[in-house]
Amino acid sequence: MSQEMPSIDHFNQMNFDEKAWHVWHKATFLIVRNSRNYRVNLYYLNGFYIQLWYHITRNKIDRISATESPRVVDTFLKMIELDLDGIMNSN
C-alpha cells in the first residue's frame, strides 16, 4: 500500500480496501453522526473530507466516499449544541 498522501482524484479511484487503509492509517477523525441504520464517520485527509458509512445492524462498512466540498460538514455541525449561557456564567 502506498504511503503517500493521495489526492482526492486518486482516492476516489481506489478500491474499497485501499480507501479503508488510508482512512485507518492516514486520515484524521473529526466527528460521527447517526443516519437511520448508519453511523457516518467524517474524516479529513490531504485537503478533502471522507465519509465512512457503517451499517449498524449488518456490522459492515457499506461506503467510503470523498469530497472537497466543506458543505459535507454542515450535516455534522447541526448536531452540535452549545450552552453559551452556561459557558459564560461558569465563572
Predicted regions and their residues:
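Polybasic/polar functional segments that serve as interface/processing modules
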Residues: 1-91
